Amino acid sequence: MYTLIIPAAGQGKRMGAGKNKLFLLIDEVPIIVHTLRAFEKDKACKSIIMAINEEERPYFEELMQKYQIEKHVQFIQGGAERQDSVYNALQYASGVEYVLVHDGARPFVTNKVIRDVLTAAEKYGASICAVPVKDTVKKVEQGVVVETVERSQLNAVQTPQGFSVSLLLEAHRSAKQSCFLGTDDASLVERVGKQVGVVEGSYYNIKVTTPEDLLIAESFLRVQKK
């Protein structure tokens, strides 16, 4: 069993929607509802903790009722950064040995990816899902190519990411003490010298970040319905 943590306090400035991007609609259903439904199907998911902006609590609670989200969702105060939100949520992750941390704006995560991440977390203590990078990657400085990066070893990391609660707490506390801000939770675990397992993600498991992503998400959903 695991608890799902969703840091949902961000404002999604790159989307330019003027509101939390998780409230934007894909096929007339909010992004966050699509995401929650993916985990509703997983019996191993004991509960869900969402770190939110307190002023958005009434709307989140309304969505839970309107779309009949049956799993228990606990809303807690988010932090200034995503990392702070996850740390806050960890304080409430009781009665389970493992947590999965997932971006609320990844509505197309599959049950297979969820299960694989959990299995790897149970094996290694920490795990991520990722897909091989398909584009050529170049290092650029001041508008000029400095280096072409070897692509064969590069992976684009997604969520969910899985952790033992004790390990992730240790990693977050260490980062907090050193004022270290990581790009994801796995980077905090790497920083304390622990191994992170990797499983195959999915190219459909996109993060809806820009208006273009929203169009792609609409297309994905149409394909799924066929």
From Swiss-Prot:
The record marks R151, K207 as: Positions MEP for the nucleophilic attack. One of its GO terms (biological process) is isopentenyl diphosphate biosynthetic process, methylerythritol 4-phosphate pathway. Transmembrane segments: none annotated. Pfam families: IspD. GO terms for molecular function: 2-C-methyl-D-erythritol 4-phosphate cytidylyltransferase activity. It comes from the Bacteria. CDD domains: CDP-ME_synthetase. Belongs to the IspD/TarI cytidylyltransferase family. IspD subfamily. This is 2-C-methyl-D-erythritol 4-phosphate cytidylyltransferase. It comes from Bacillus cereus (strain ATCC 14579 / DSM 31 / CCUG 7414 / JCM 2152 / NBRC 15305 / NCIMB 9373 / NCTC 2599 / NRRL B-3711).
